[in-house]
Amino acid sequence: MGDDGIEWELEDLDGGVLYDVFYESTTMLAGRMLAQRRLAAARGDRDGERRAEADRHGLLAARDKVGPTDRRTLIAAKRSNDAARGARAEAVAPWHAVGGSLKVDVEGIWRDDIRPVVDAAERSDKPCTVFVGGQPGAGKTRATHLVRVSGLHDGPLLPVNGDDLRQYHPDYDRLCDEEPLAMPERTAKASAAWIRMTMEYADENGIPAIVEGTWRNAATVLDEAANAKHAGRSTHAVVLAVPPVLSRLAMLERYY
C-alpha cells in the first residue's frame, strides 16, 4: 500500500471491483452536488442552484461513457471524483445540519428530482425489463453496463439501481461522511419506494429498463417480472454466479 493508501489499492483492484468503486465514487459526488443544489435553493441562490445541477448532469453523463475495462480512465476518474467531493466539503457543510432534520418527502422527491430523469428516457414500442441479480460484491454494476452496451435490447436501457437512488435522500451526503455504515439502512426505505415508483412509471410509459439488485427477496423480483409481463414487456434475467469467497474479498477490496 502506498503512503496515501487509496491510490495503491486502486492499482490492485480487479476489473469488476474497480468499476464498482468508480461508479460508487461518482454517485457520492453526485449526491454532494445534489446537496449543494438543495442548499442553494433553500438560500434563494438561483445561480448556485443552476451551477450545481449543471455540474451534476455533466458528471453523470461522463460516467456513462467510461468503459468497465478501461482501467486507466477508471482509476483517474475515481481519484478525480474523490478530490472534487473533498473540495466541496466546506461549501456543503451547512446542508448537513438541515438534511438530517428533514422529513423525507418520498413523493415530492420522486416528483421533483427523480421523475424528470426517468421521463427523459427513450420510449420503445417493444419495451423490455432486464433483471440483474447477484450478491453484494458480485460485480452487478459492471454487468449492468455490459448488458446496456451488448445489444440485448435495440435501444437504450434505463438503469434502475437502488444505490443510485439513495443519493436523493436529504441526509445521504452527511451519512456518507459521518455514518457510512448506517447509510444503507437509513436510506433503504426511501430507496425501495423510489425503485417501485420508477418501475411503475417505466411499465406505464414503455421505457426499457435494467434493474440491478441482490434478489434477497425472491417474491419482490418475481412480482416485478409479472408486472412487466402484464404491461406487455419482454423480460430477461442476468444472474451472476460468483463464489461467496470472491464476493467477500471484493467487498473487502472495495471498502478497505
Residue ranges and their predicted role:
Residues 143:
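Hydrophobic positions on the alpha1 helix immediately C-terminal to the Walker A/P-loop
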Residues 120-127, 202-203:
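Phosphate-binding P-loop
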Residues 140:
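Conserved lysine of the Walker
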Residues 57-77:
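Amphipathic alpha-helical coiled-coil segments
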Residues 135-136:
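The conserved Walker
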Residues 154-159, 164-225:
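Conserved nucleotide-sensing/catalytic segment adjacent to the nucleotide-binding pocket
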